[in-house]
Amino acid sequence: MARIAGVNLPAQKHVWVGLQSIYGIGRTRSKKLCESAGVTSTTKIRDLSEPEIERLRAEVGKYVVEGDLRREIGIAIKRLMDLGCYRGLRHRRGHPLRGQRTRTNARTRKGPRKAIRK
């Protein structure tokens, strides 16, 4: 089991799939990382040699991933809320940000229904 960016990658999966278990790496970036590290993307993680794992670590290290990315996103949202702009207010209230309707639907963002008090 290889450990990259503080995440244990599942040994039985292909490299390009396993890299996606790192927060901030999706399909496209995963395949580009394999290509730039010189690793065949369809190789299983358990079959990687130590130099290949090191090359992957170096390539992943060039991107903001995991805790640093989560922190950056949190800071960006907090900045919007502190500014008091429309998007910040929507974050603060827990409503959808991008113009979706809220009269019906939007339950995922708003949470479960609140009981009506009389």
Curated annotation (Swiss-Prot):
Q: What does this protein do?
A: Located at the top of the head of the 30S subunit, it contacts several helices of the 16S rRNA. In the 70S ribosome it contacts the 23S rRNA (bridge B1a) and protein L5 of the 50S subunit (bridge B1b), connecting the 2 subunits; these bridges are implicated in subunit movement. Contacts the tRNAs in the A and P-sites.
Query: Which HAMAP family does this entry report, sorted A to Z?
Result: Ribosomal_uS13 (MF_01315)
Q: Which UniProt keywords apply?
A: Ribonucleoprotein, Ribosomal protein, RNA-binding, rRNA-binding, tRNA-binding
Q: What is this protein called?
A: Small ribosomal subunit protein uS13
Q: Its GO biological process terms?
A: translation
Annotated spans, Disordered? 92-118
The organism encoding this protein is Xanthomonas campestris pv. campestris (strain ATCC 33913 / DSM 3586 / NCPPB 528 / LMG 568 / P 25)
Lineage, top ranks: Bacteria, Pseudomonadati, Pseudomonadota, Gammaproteobacteria, Lysobacterales
Membrane-traversing stretches: none
Q: How does it assemble?
A: Part of the 30S ribosomal subunit. Forms a loose heterodimer with protein S19. Forms two bridges to the 50S subunit in the 70S ribosome.
Mind telling me which GO cellular component terms the entry cites? cytosol; small ribosomal subunit
Its domain of life reads Bacteria
Task: Say if the entry is tagged with keyword Metal-binding.
Answer: no
